[in-house]
Amino acid sequence: MSDIKKVVLAYSGGLDTSVILKWLQDNYDAEVVTFTADIGQGEELEPARKKALQLGIKQDNIFIEDLREEFVRDFVFPMFRANTIYEGEYLLGTSIARPLIAKRQIEIARATGAQAVSHGATGKGNDQVRFELGYYALEPGIKVIAPWREWDLLSREKLLAYAEKAGIPIEMKHKQGGAPYSMDANLLHISFEGRHLEDPKAEAEADMWRWTVSPEQAPDQAEYIDIEYEHGDPVAINGKRLSAAEMLTELNRLGGKHGIGRLDLVENRYVGMKSRGCYETPGGTIMLKAHRGIESITLDREVAHLKDDLMARYASLIYNGYWWSPERRAIQVLIDHTQEKVNGWVRVKLYKGSVSVVARDSKETLFDKTIATFDDDGGAYNQADAGGFIKLNALRMRIAENARRQRG
């Protein structure tokens, strides 16, 4: 422990990371640097600064940064270019936030001369893996302190007792039993875990959802919006250009208004267990559908199918914490190359929990009406050619069947 003189802590200002802050001071006798990232969680972050100061952190060692634009531009959008979904449903809202936080912790560690970084992820979850794989990928010699794998404060009662003894300010909600769920939010989504959600037989309570109205209570009138794309990224809604963070914020508002993006999921964690989580991803759900819509007329068939084949692997890499790995970067290069001609607009219909593409157009379109039409195409497509095409593709199956018959 003696070689760790300074440590950069991913700090939210909440109970857990405040206890970790004090625990690091007590057990490592190290100078603590706090890093708090605004990635759109919707919380006031200045209380984190105030609490850090109360716990003895120097003003120069408190870093609070607005990373919303970087988060959406450099992490969310690249992921959505691949139409990324984990296990058929999950849009990876928590997973994609960890690489950015890890990156900034390492950058701050370099700038401040810290020998170690620390996080508040538990020893049961995926986040410990995501954070630490990022740390080691970006700074191979960094030391990592994961308190939940070291200390004996394994219950809320023990955490509260430690906090009271250490003089850590405790919010009333924690004294009254804590929040009803473990929640994590950023501009892409909000997640809910724990408490009665740990029983997969129990339906989530109606008042749990924060960002979306119930689809049953959504407006009776459908809403149509046009989303413009450039190189696979959304850049404008109804003709109004928006920054990356503004785009996702507005899509969240629209999706939430129409009850879009709710998900109740049992997923397979990288650490081996199954875990239930509920998610609200209104803007991301719209983006996924719209992006597939513009790709449908701009991507070559085999390129589109190759992307689909790679997507599951790409999703697992992000979910499991390998954003900074060479294989994820390699896939990203290919994905980004496919998006060069993904330009145009998509019209989507938002209605009572559903989003559907109803129109799309692009100067780069590969849709040729003269060939695709059911009417007379003037010779653009010779239907007689299909006979030879079919026979050649049936040849191997005909050979196999003839061989079977000869064998009796």
From Swiss-Prot:
Pfam hit, one: Arginosuc_syn_C
UniProt-annotated binding residues for L-aspartate: 122, 126-127
GO biological process: argininosuccinate metabolic process; L-arginine biosynthetic process; urea cycle
GO terms for cellular component: cytoplasm
Amino acids binding ATP: 10-18, 37, 120
Subcellular location: Cytoplasm
Catalytic reaction annotation: L-citrulline + L-aspartate + ATP = 2-(N(omega)-L-arginino)succinate + AMP + diphosphate + H(+)
Subunit structure: Homotetramer.
Similarity comment: Belongs to the argininosuccinate synthase family. Type 1 subfamily.
NCBIfam families: argG (TIGR00032), PRK00509.1 (NF001770)
Name under which the protein is recorded: Argininosuccinate synthase
Source organism of this protein record: Paraburkholderia phytofirmans (strain DSM 17436 / LMG 22146 / PsJN)
Encoding gene (name): argG
